[in-house]
Amino acid sequence: MSKGFGPMGQFQEALKRVKQIQEGSAKLQDELAALSIEGVAGGGLVKVTLSGNQEPTGVTIDPQLLSESKEVVEDLLLTAYKDAYTKSAETMKAKMQELTGGMELPPGLGF
């Protein structure tokens, strides 16, 4: 049976695509690690930076915020982190869709 015809051809094409995805995922991990994604809160008083693979890489707090209560600072930190995390997750998802051509991966096989 020639390649591309019937179940065997479909299986071979699927295996080829899986191999391409595996090869691309290592490159994608490096690309994501190099990204810097910033979340902000309080009009820029607090900034949290994550890599594209969601590793925290920095926190900036405007000195004027330090006169506020502990609870205000904590709330703004959490809000900025959530903003960065959401942006990072969206970036990761978009890049995975590029890599997989929109093919849905089973749970646990994505990032």
Swiss-Prot record:
User: Which keywords has UniProt assigned to this entry?
Assistant: Cytoplasm, DNA-binding
Give the UniProt entry's GO cellular component terms: bacterial nucleoid; cytosol
| UniProt-listed Pfam families | YbaB_DNA_bd
Give the subcellular location. Cytoplasm, Nucleoid
Q: What is its main location?
A: cytoplasm
A single GO molecular function, which one? DNA binding
Is RNA-binding one of the keywords UniProt gives this record? no
Keyword Aminoacyl-tRNA synthetase included in the entry's annotation: no
**The protein's role, per its UniProt record:** Binds to DNA and alters its conformation. May be involved in regulation of gene expression, nucleoid organization and DNA protection.
The family this protein is said to belong to: Belongs to the YbaB/EbfC family.
Subunit structure, interactors included: Homodimer.
Matching entries from PANTHER family are given as: NUCLEOID-ASSOCIATED PROTEIN YBAB (PTHR33449:SF1)
Q: What is this protein called?
A: Nucleoid-associated protein glr3498
Whose protein is this, by species? Gloeobacter violaceus (strain ATCC 29082 / PCC 7421)
